[in-house]
Amino acid sequence: MMVFQSFILGNLVSLCMKIINSVVVVGLYYGFLTTFSIGPSYLFLLRARVMDEGEEGTEKKVSATTGFIAGQLMMFISIYYAPLHLALGRPHTITVLALPYLLFHFFWNNHKHFFDYGSTTRNEMRNLRIQCVFLNNLIFQLFNHFILPSSMLARLVNIYMFRCNNKMLFVTSSFVGWLIGHILFMKWVGLVLVWIQQNHSIRSNVLIRSNKYKFLVSELRNSMARIFSILLFITCVYYLGRIPSPIFTKKLKGTSETGGTKQDQEVSTEEAPFPSLFSEEREDLDKIDEMEEIRVNGKDKINKDDEFHVRTYYNYKTVSENLDGNKENSNLEFFKIKKKEDRFLWFEKPFVTLVFDYKRWNRPNRYIKNDKIENTVRNEMSQYFFYTCQSDGKERISFTYPPNLSTFFEMIQKKIPSFTREKRPSDQVSTYWSLINEEKKENLKKEFLNRIDALDKEWSGENILEKTTRFCHNETKKEYLPKIYDPFLHGVSRGRIKKLPQFQIITESNRKKNIGGSWINKIHGILLKINYHKFEQTIEKLNRESLSIEKKLSFFSEPQEEKIYSEEEIQIFKFLFDVVITDSNDQTLIKNFMDFHEITKKVPRWSYKLISELEDLEGENEENVTMEPGIRSRKAKRVVVFTDKEPHNEIYTNLKDNQNSDQNDEMALIRYSQQSDFRREIIKGSMRSQRRKTVIWEFFQAKVHSPLFFDRIDKLFYFSFDIWGLKKKILSNLMCKKKKKKKMDKKDEEQSKIEEKRQIEIAETWDSFLFAQIIRGSLLVTQSILRKYIILPLLIIIKNSVRMLLFQFPEWSEDLKDWKREMHVKCTYNGVQLSETEFPKNWLTDGIQIKILFPFYLKPWHKQSSQKARLKKKRDKGEKKDFCFLTVWGMETELPFGSAQKKPSFFEPISKELKKRINKFKTKSFLVLRIFKERATIFIKVTKEIKNRILKNFLFIKGKIKDLSKRNLIPLFGPREIYELNETKKDSIMSNQMIHELSVQKKSMEWTNSSLSENKIQNVIDRIKTIRNQIKEISKEKQNLTNSCNKLRYDSKIIEPSKKIWQTFKRKNTRLIRKSIFFIKFCIEQLSIAIFLGIINIPRITTQLFFESTKTILDKYIYKAEENGEKKKKKKNTIYFISTIKNLISNKKKISYDLCSLSQAYVFYKLSQIQVSNFSKLKAVLEYNICITSLFVKNQIKDFFQEQGIFHYDLKDKTFFNSEVNQWKNWLRSNYQYNLPQIAWARLVTKKWKKKINQDSLVLNPSLTKEDSYEKKKFDNYKKQSVFEADSLLNPKHNLKKNSIYNLFCYKSIHSTEKTFDTSIGIALDNCLVSCFLEKYNIRGIGEIRHRKYLDWRILNFWFTKKVNIEPWVDTKSKKKYINTKVQNYQRIDKITKTGLANQKSLFFDWMGMNEEILNRRITNFEFFFFPEFFLFSSTYKMKPWVIPIKLLLLNFNENINVNKKITRKKKGFIPSNEKKSLRFYNLNKEEKESASQVELESDKENKKNPESALLKQEKNIEENYAESTIKKRKNKKQYKSNTEAELDLFLTRHSRFQLRWNCFFNQKILNNVKVYCLLVRLKNPNEIAISSIERGEMSLDILMIEKNFTFAKLMKKGILIIEPVRLSVQNDGQLIIYRTIGISLVHKNKHKISQRYKKKSYSDKQKIEKSITKYQNKTVNRKKNNYDFFVPENILSPKRRREFRILICFNLKKKNARDRNSRFDKNIQNLTTVLDKKKDLVKNKNNLIKFKSFLWPNFRLEDLACMNRYWFNTTNGNHFSMIRIHMYTRFPLH
């Protein structure tokens, strides 16, 4: 049964998925969505429904709906029908149709009374009103919609149509869906209208409050026409905003220069006679006039200049006779016809360009010339072009197919019928393709194994290594193309030689002579439609020697097995690539070819060389022609402050027009207007609404403000809450609540009535709709399921997990109990409860309610309260309803269709508890003080009372003793006497009282008749008398008491007073006992808090103890590891480089030299000279890792050299052996690590040392051979030709000394095994270069810098980053390639980094790729940075200077030290082409500072002759034109006194953007100072005025730049000046990527050597050897050998063949059999073992495995990603080839 149920359920799910994914459902969904795209068509539809009444109104309604539906049907049909789609889906339909039609309706209908729009006769057809309504709704439905744009929906349709098979079904279903949505919408509109008409509550309760609003609804109904006209006007305005009207905008001038006037503006499209060859649109021939628009859009190849030049060839004499005698027109006859038709299209063309050109002049999206981009239009082209191509042997749609290739292939197919291929079955094609690839792979494998066998048989290196193929320019002269232009060397990234035509007049005779020797390729002939039958008679094969390809040093023959091509392919190949040589005697051919003319076409382009009004004011226009500013800037005026009338001589040499112009340098300021700037740098004529995004904050932000970088922003409290203000508001609200309570009661009564009415209305509306109850019921059921089983359990899990994280006990049981208690009861539509599972009958149609009993509310905690407390709560608050009804939105209501009630907040009890805790803390903190205060007051009162009682008793006893002593002279002893004394005292008191009363009575009897005043006086006198008597008596009693106190006992004397004291104490104690309860509670609470805090702190204390214990264990382990590492370092004596110079300890200082790269190059140079090589010895050397980075073991190398007889390490002979430079280069190129680009070579110290040694040894060594002297002559000749000064910093004597030192140092490096070493070499080098640099340029701290290992970056002054500007160029006379290295101020630090740093190793590898990143770093202060990664380098270097070497980190803006020394030289008469092309700034004074430059020579062959004279003329023309253009541009520019000024100006204007930040007060101060400066500059004696302005306070001295050496660094530290560089894209070639990738994965051990001053921790990781070392870690592996220095067998093949071999292996991975694939590759590996070691197996030898894997892995990884993905498949993600790498390499076991 269970299986059956699951089967049914699975079928239902699959059925539902099929229904959802079906075409009909998707079409319905799309159609339903289109109903929401409400456009202007709905205005007419709604007007017909609202306004028209009667019989004619119903007809109008019907016509409006039919027209509306018909228009929508046309839109849906246009999806399927392409012509209709092109007509309706273009944006110009809005411009042509919508706006005039809308405006016509608005102005036509606005003057009429819309409500009285009816006609007199019913069926009158002359009015055509019903037809107009139909047309309105039909036409307006075709317009683009604006509430929900239809473009989004159209894209959805196109996406689905692309993968949909049954397209017509999709269109019909979408139309049906739209129809359903439209019906629902119109029903809803009808219900709204009926509700407005029938609802009396609007007039009675809501709107009509007085007689004023009595007729509001009627007026609203009557003014519907006006409302619709207003809506129509708003629509017109909206479309006007979207459609830029070209009538009211200013038209800019377009550039219409022809391309033939300038040489550099020609595009290599001579072969293309039709514009359709290079355009993607493939227009018809009669649309050639519109091609200019397509070219402007950048879809073809556009060069860097602003004109576009198309060269086509055609024949004026188009009539030529065929063999049949018929006449035919040529293929370019249409030009003549088009010229005739142009006169009729004088109106059509501007109208078309006005309407349809979306990139017209009033669009602000044109490109503007700046310092980086100087093109009219960027070469932007879509990377997606769909075309069929073969992939994996099958025809597939490629989305990155070259469009030019596809058009060319289509043309060839049309012209040549043999190109049309028969379609083969896909299986046959794939098998054929796989067989070809398998054959290629086998051939490569054989060649690879043959080369390995040759290596094993110890052949010479020339026979083993495959050399690169170079393109030969001239075979007899053995001239090759330069490396940058050679397609075999550079592939896709190669350059393109532009052979520019000479300026010479070609006469008819010259043309006829030249035609005799001309030849035409057959491909050109096919495209030109020339008569082939005549040409085929004169076919001769191409002389292949003229285009021969020489393979240099290829010692292996081609594979014997060649592919057998079919006859058709051979014929096609011959037909295409044979050459037709014209015969001079054939007059027809001469006629055809002599009449070729060049057609130059003017292409209109909008000007892109625009300048702003601000630039025009500042005078920064580079051209002589005055230009109108094309960009609107803020309103400003140029105020000239100072004019320098001293003339500056401008000297230009070797030019046609030498002129000395005097210019007056003006110093001007720009004064802006105070009004706000609304121009925002907008282009003149463009629309303001369509401008680019404008900056609303600062133009250049010092810090990031985007939410994307929120984690990098300093965490600050952006919002501050006013707590006291909130408290005041709360208190004021509480006070006002009582007053508002009565008002609230009345409002509640009214609200309840309104709520009831609203519930009834909602219930009725749900009943009125057709499918409303179905939708509502399904939504309710889904909401109940979501609430019960998804949302609430998730909330429970989150809550309890948070409690566990906060170290609190979870409440799973309580929450689950409450959750299970919640019940969802299904009810009828009226609210009758049924059960949890039972649904009411017909609930989908009749409706349903869901009642929730005991709704679950998430609580932060559960309190265990007693039953009494619960009953108390119920009595106080009343019984709360434990049920609610569920709404469609998942909310809760008390009644069905009621308003949603608020749920009890989860965070409210938390906030209450927090408030309670805070209040308790406050009360407890002050409770102790209160108690102490109360106790203190009680104690003081008690003491006072005791004191008063004692005094009273004492006085009383004393008086009584006196009385007793008077009456009884007997000694008073015993209690009896005291008792008698007390009785006598009482009697006396009573007698006194009676006497007093009697006296008063007598007096009152006697003086009844007397006056009041006399009585008062008498009473006062009597009282005084009585008081006196009493005082006397008391004094007597005191005396008696003192006399008789000795007779009384002490115990009996204080019995009665002690009783009274006890009573007072008893009273006070009861009070204390009553208040002591609070004190006890306080103590108990404090104890409980302390215990609770202790329990909470237990896990924290335990974790802290755990971390501390682990930390101590780790510290001990690290300390032991460090000790072990130091011991191992002490034990090690292995030296990997043959030329590593030992650190020599002298008495004064320790100097160590590192010329590892020099000696390595020298050893390879020696090895390349071996004429009779014995590779049995070389094999032993290969085992010890020579071929990659040459870490030699000294003893074995020494023995090998002794046996070969190359040199002896004891014999100090300076004679060098003979060699060719090319062999040396080829040896280096065979190792791909040395085959780097020129920029990478220039950055390496290796290349520079090699160059210095070559140059200096050639000049000074007397024992050179003839060949070396020839090289010397070549170098000297080059110096004479280009007037190049090799080293202008040093004099000839210094050069002589330097050369001898280099020579000696080179010699010493070979004999580095000697124990003694001449320290004078190091001192001489140090003095020669370090001191030269430091003293020449006046750098402070010379003595400290010389002998430092780590140079402090704050000492030196460098303005630019360490980037070398290298411009490769070709010397046409010798065909040599030079690199002009422009050395700026910042580059001279190289001399310090080479020699001055003693222990710093100049290694081959880039230090983990950090060189490139630090060279490309920003020019800014690090306090204001965009990305904190750059800040890391600076901060780590400041703390630990050993992290980054000195040459890698030079900060940019440090203390400015002016260069005072200048070297003067005379201007030469001839400016070399090198200086013309590279130097940007000329120094026009007699004194100028030279910048040192370096030249790098690369000679390809020995005997190279001068090239042709045409190339020389071209080179001269280029030089002259370049010099003219540069000097013309510099005429209006500011001239500089030194190169430092020029560089600084270039830096500030071209390469950076700066920004000043200060407050308004500081700004005002500066402005006041500037105003004073403007006056002072003009005066001859400004002292008096300056002093007076200072006294008046106009000029403030605190902001003056008083310091002489005031630098930008201080301003940047303070944050006033912010300088950021312009972000430029850096283009890296593939070889540099290889170099950087290997540099990341392989880290040299010498990188981690440190000085004794800074000790570094070394960690050994034996388990993870393969891990790449990150940039910020230094990790050394303790091994006996360097595992990455070994011979890679794969380097036997050339890089091209190597890639081909790998790719063929990758293509073979389609078979899902990884075992076979690995076994094949393992076989290759086993064959390779013979190279590395014959005796040992590769699998067993762990070291060789690690070596093999560590080198092959980065090679494969890099080339797979960079070459295959990026350039071939146009993907940058490497996931596609991850499985290839997994299958390619097995995991080697590590023991």
Curated annotation (Swiss-Prot):
Gene that encodes the chain: TIC214
Comp. bias (Basic and acidic residues): 1498-1511
GO cellular component: chloroplast inner membrane
Membrane-spanning intervals of the chain: 19-39, 68-88, 91-111, 133-153, 176-196, 227-247
Listed InterPro entries: TIC214
Keyword entries, A-Z: Chloroplast, Membrane, Plastid, Plastid inner membrane, Protein transport, Transmembrane, Transmembrane helix, Transport
Protein origin, superkingdom: Eukaryota
Designated name of the protein: Protein TIC 214
Pfam families per the UniProt record, alphabetical: Ycf1
Region (Disordered): 1492-1511
Extra remark beyond the main annotation: There is a partial copy of the N-terminus (positions 1-343) of ycf1 in the inverted repeat (BAF50158).
Family the entry assigns: Belongs to the TIC214 family.
Principal location: plastid
GO-annotated biological processes: protein transport
UniProt-annotated location(s): Plastid, Chloroplast inner membrane
Subunit structure: Part of the Tic complex.
Function: Involved in protein precursor import into chloroplasts. May be part of an intermediate translocation complex acting as a protein-conducting channel at the inner envelope.
Membrane topology: Multi-pass membrane protein
